[in-house]
Amino acid sequence: VWHSSAPFPGRSGAVTKRSRIGRTIVGNKPKSDSRRVPPLPPEHFLNRELQALKFNRRVLAQAEDRATPPLERLKFLCIVSSNLDEYFEIRVAGVKEQLKLGAAAAEADGLAPREIYSRLTTIARELVARQYVLLNEEILPALAAAGIRFLRRGEWTPAQQEWVREFFFREMMPVLTPIGLDPAHPFPRVFNKSLNFAVELEGRDAFGRDSRAAIVQAPRVLPRVIRLPRGVAGGPDDFIFLTSILHAHVGELFAGMNVVGCHQFRVTRNSDLFVEEEEVKDLRKALQGELPQRHLGDAVRLEVDDTMTPAMASFLLEQLGLAETDLYRVNGPVNLVRLMSVPDQVDRPDLKYRPFQPGLPKALAKSKDLFETLRKGDVLLHRPFQSFAPVIDFIREAARDPQVVAIKQTVYRTGTDS
């Protein structure tokens, strides 16, 4: 299969022997053949990178549709963020890699890597801007009206402030390690898609050192959205962001110093896997060697809250080897994906889609012996409209059949509860 981002038959250029796991594998360039149909003009092709973003426009449109139940709108918003994360990790990383290598030739669709990058960043910025406007102006107010609130620091009651303080010292303080940014401390390793805080300081630390800034990394074990217990919640479903708790108590991490600013940021890194296919004898071992490095690939995007000072944003860009075009300022949590947990914590069927009940193919509806049914002919199973139960039954019957010597499956993108 030839994509517009791969060398097109009939075009000149070397063909890589290095394949990307999860991406198009480019084979040897076809030999010259005078009988081959000449290449089609660019207008006959769609650019894969740009089309992926246009797909996310359609997903975002579902979140923007006011006929969609509020908690489902939140889910669609989270899906867009999750898709964009993967898009930057793989697709944008690939384009930036081409630019780094000096690739300038246009693809079959007539677009060169620099033009592709320019267009995709424009569309991505438009999507992100629409996301946060939608979150702040429609979805959060709609949820608040229904009794699902995300409380800001200024809205906390004295009882809630005390609960938050106890939560900070009990759950957060033991796992937070501030890292000073000075000549004695190199810029810390910031893992892919992790939540971090850039803290601006005044004064001297406990060792008498004059420190102007520090980084605080939030471990993944800490929940990004915390539900208030009923004893202190002011409503049926009150939540607080982890970022709000840290902002309220970040000074506890810097004794004797004055915190003048605390800003969340998040780095997206190149997460593609590279394997020299022709030289690898054991693919499993090769992947085991590559996987640990995915969290520390080249940075491709920096997300910061919109209150971060230009000086701090420029400093982070410089440390990460990024340009201003890679910076995305947002008015809200830098990782909307973590809001996906909220609908599961709220028992409000009136704010969700009615659960869908998948059916069974006619051939399996009354079947008592799956193997016997399959001997009569193939059965098409159309997920998610039809139940996954026949697959489980198939495995179960195979496991019990003495004539079955092995069961092998390809597992891809399983659910969290699989």
Segments predicted by a language model, with ranges:
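N-terminal localization/anchoring segments of enzymes in phospholipid and broader phosphate metabolism
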Residues: K17-S418
